[in-house]
Amino acid sequence: MVEWTDSERAIINSIFSNLDYEEIGRKSLCRCLIVYPWTQRYFGGFGNLYNAETILCNPLIAAHGTKILHGLDRALKNMDDIKNTYAELSLLHSDKLHVDPDNFRLLADCLTGVIAAKMVPAFTVDTQVGWQKFRSFVVSALGREYH
């Protein structure tokens, strides 16, 4: 079980309350696919991912980025039990999709950069500390079935 301070809970809720899920989700997934091109192998059914421009303009990638970000709502609503909240999703990614669990961290890194850029100057050190704790528990929960 994760222990959260009132301040950490407030920080995470504040971040999510101000997110444009479509914009942040799209930008984060696009950034991940462009910066870490080997992650594209999981998106073979999403059409042309030939270069950065085609990735940025791909509506399937945009929609999936939004879906991923909305998936974080589950962790937000279940902050005290993130591990069990994502147990089924972890199983799907490990057993059926065979996603390299390190890709969760790569996407989380990209999401952090996009959120920080959007929130400037509100993405303070304290905000980042709370966010890093949240995202680290999500990444760990998603990779749980790989252990």
From Swiss-Prot:
CDD domains: Hb-beta-like (cd08925). GO terms for cellular component: blood microparticle; haptoglobin-hemoglobin complex; hemoglobin complex. It holds the Pfam family Globin. PROSITE patterns: GLOBIN. GO terms for molecular function: haptoglobin binding; heme binding; metal ion binding; organic acid binding; oxygen binding; oxygen carrier activity; peroxidase activity. Keywords: Heme, Iron, Metal-binding, Oxygen transport, Transport. InterPro entries: Globin, Globin-like_sf, Globin/Proto, Hemoglobin_b, Hemoglobin_oxygen_transport. Gene3D superfamilies: Globins. Coiled coil: none annotated. Heme b binds at H64, H93. Residues 3-147 form the Globin domain. One of its GO terms (biological process) is hydrogen peroxide catabolic process. Red blood cells. Heterotetramer of two alpha chains and two beta chains. Belongs to the globin family. PANTHER family: HEMOGLOBIN FAMILY MEMBER (PTHR11442), HEMOGLOBIN SUBUNIT EPSILON (PTHR11442:SF7). Involved in oxygen transport from gills to the various peripheral tissues. This is Hemoglobin subunit beta. It comes from Gadus morhua. The lineage of its organism: Eukaryota, Metazoa, Chordata, Craniata, Vertebrata. The gene is hbb.
